[in-house]
């Protein structure tokens, strides 16, 4: 005090303060297992070793959140992933089942389509066959017409029999109601042959026979009151099934 110097009651006050040294700072960091950041302010500043100052330390520790050890929270956390997996599994199973049903439906529709195509092909074949048969029928009709001949469809039946001709039944008009075959013979002139009236298109049943003794001489006449038709006689007995000869005049 006499020398004008300050006296410290503590012998350690004259030296460097350990609380503000870097060693203490690192010691605190090493002792603290958690990472921390700190700021400090030394007040008041002054010349070295001739003043005292106070260090204020502010530490901010970054600590992780406390994990709860509650059994209910752990179980609920575990159940959520299991529930999600179960839902995903069920969804995938539904998708697979739907895809399988769609594949089955596609196969069924393909089978039905094939059946319809076969039916259409069969119908087309039947139509082609009908067309072919129609053409064949027309060809056969043309050949028949060519063999019979054109109108009036007359041609000789037997060449060695005189006054004998074959006449197509439809050479006469079909609207002739009553046709009478008359001859001059034993039954008298103007008598009806067999007293039978015939339709115009029923020449196959015509039994108009001439006198056998008058073959080539006297020819009976068939008349319907409008026109006159000459019936050719023959000296040979007619048998059933042989053509009856008649000639239109």
Curated annotation (Swiss-Prot):
GO terms for biological process: DNA-templated transcription; response to zinc ion. It is found in: Nucleus. GO terms for cellular component: nucleus. Residues 66-90 are annotated as: Disordered. Disruption phenotype: No visible phenotype under normal growth conditions. Mutant seedlings grown under normal conditions accumulate reduced levels of zinc in roots. Mutant seedlings grown in zinc-depleted medium have reduced root length. InterPro entries: bZIP, bZIP_sf, C/EBP. The keyword Transcription applies. Residues 78-98 are annotated as: Basic motif. Coiled coil: none annotated. Signal peptide: none annotated. Keywords: DNA-binding, Nucleus, Transcription, Transcription regulation. Residues 102-116 are annotated as: Leucine-zipper. GO terms for molecular function: DNA binding; DNA-binding transcription factor activity. Residues 74-121 form the bZIP domain. The keyword rRNA-binding does not apply. It comes from the Eukaryota. Induction: Induced by zinc deficiency. SUPFAM superfamilies: Leucine zipper domain. It holds the Pfam family bZIP_2. SMART domains: BRLZ (SM00338). PANTHER family: BASIC LEUCINE ZIPPER 23, CCAAT/ENHANCER BINDING PROTEIN. Transcription factor involved in the response to zinc ion deficiency. Binds to the consensus sequence 5'-[AG]TGTCGACA[CT]-3' also called zinc deficiency response element (ZDRE). The ZDRE sequence is conserved in the plant kingdom and present in the promoters of genes that constitute the primary response to zinc deficiency, comprising additional ZIP metal transporter genes. Required for zinc accumulation in roots. Mediates the expression of the zinc transporter ZIP12 during growth in zinc-deficient conditions. ZIP12 transporter is involved in zinc uptake in roots. This is Basic leucine zipper 23. It comes from Arabidopsis thaliana.
